Amino acid sequence: MDLASKDSYIQRLASKVISQPDQERKKKQFAYPQGKRYNGPLNNNKKKGNRKSFKEKDTRGKTPGFPKKSLSSIQPTQKGAANKNGQKAQTQSINGSSTQALEGGNESKFSTVDILRKRLHEKIEESRGQGAPKDALSEAVQAKRAKRKLERERKKRKRKEFRMKELAQQNVEEQQPELKPKAVCESAATKRNVQAIIFNKVEMVEEGYVDKVQKKKNKKQSMKGNITPLTGKNYKQLLSRVEARNAKLEGLREKDEAKARDLEEKIKWTNLLYKAEGIKIKDDEEMLRTALKKKEQKRAQRKKKWAELSGNLAEKMQQRQDKRTRNIQKRKQLKTEKKKNKARKKGRVLPEDLKKAAV
């Protein structure tokens, strides 16, 4: 049970205790004749045996408990009984405190709700750690307080130092003049020259659209001595070009040997220039023939392999189709046989059975 529920329970209990005596019927004040005095409370109730009595509990030196029966009535004084000296009649309350009847019959009602509420608030404060400790001046408490004080001072000092550092840094920054770096736009070529190695960097060179005519012009300009280089992997075309060039040289040599020699030298120099640029020149007739032969052999092998593969594939497909048709026929026969057996069981005579019987 938590403290809030305890508090609500105690308040309900106290309200019952207080409200129960008040619920009794209030009696009208009786005016006594002159010469007579008040000797005690009147008791007009004839049924004295029905009245409840207090259960006296000695709770001296103990915290008040919560009794099972919260309602208790005070024993009434006998009719006409009065003390000459005005003695005090004591009755025990729920929490052990006594209520005293003063002289002249004026009763002082002692409220238990305030005491219970006070004790509950004290317990709540103790549980939160806000209440005053029992031994306020004990060594442990003093040591704890001193430790907390030192910690607070240390944190305060640290904050102050940090603030001072920040202020000093701001002053230094303000004193230094602001130097704006000059924005220098360097070209991609100069960057490449300055930085020999560039990692994780791709420089895109913007090139305009080049049409076919311009491409042809560029190709002609790149050609050296109006002689196209013999490059590529189309060995058949290269071989035909080499054969045509050799035939041209032979024809020119028959007419003019000097011109043929000049053309040969020109071809050699242009080939050397192309090779210097990194272009591989394929002008050897024998090597071109062997390369062409190898290429044709590979092509023939691939063709043969493909034919075998396609033939095997067609054969396999036909086998699968035949197997499928056989399985379908078998299933149909089984179905018809099943139907015939059912008919025979029912007593039907089939033409097949008659033929067998005749034989």
Swiss-Prot record:
Q: What keywords tag this UniProt record?
A: Nucleus
According to its UniProt record, where is this protein located? Nucleus, Nucleolus
Q: Where is the composition biased (Basic residues)?
A: 144-160, 295-305, 326-348
Q: Which domain of life is it from?
A: Eukaryota
Q: Where in this protein does the record put region Disordered?
A: 15-106, 124-160, 295-359
Q: Which family does it belong to?
A: Belongs to the SURF6 family.
Function, as annotated: Involved in a nucleolar function.
Q: Which organism is it from?
A: Takifugu rubripes
Biased composition (Basic and acidic residues) is annotated at: 349-359
Question: GO CC terms on record?
Answer: nucleolus
Q: Which GO terms describe its molecular function?
A: DNA binding; RNA binding
Taxonomically, what lineage is the organism? Eukaryota, Metazoa, Chordata, Craniata, Vertebrata
Task: Provide the primary localization.
Answer: nucleus
**Sequence ranges of Polar residues compositional bias:** 70-101
Signal peptide coordinates: none
Question: Is Nucleus among this UniProt entry's keywords?
Answer: yes
Q: From the Swiss-Prot or TrEMBL record, give the protein name.
A: Surfeit locus protein 6 homolog
Its gene name is surf6
Which one GO biological process term can you cite for this protein?
A: ribosomal small subunit biogenesis
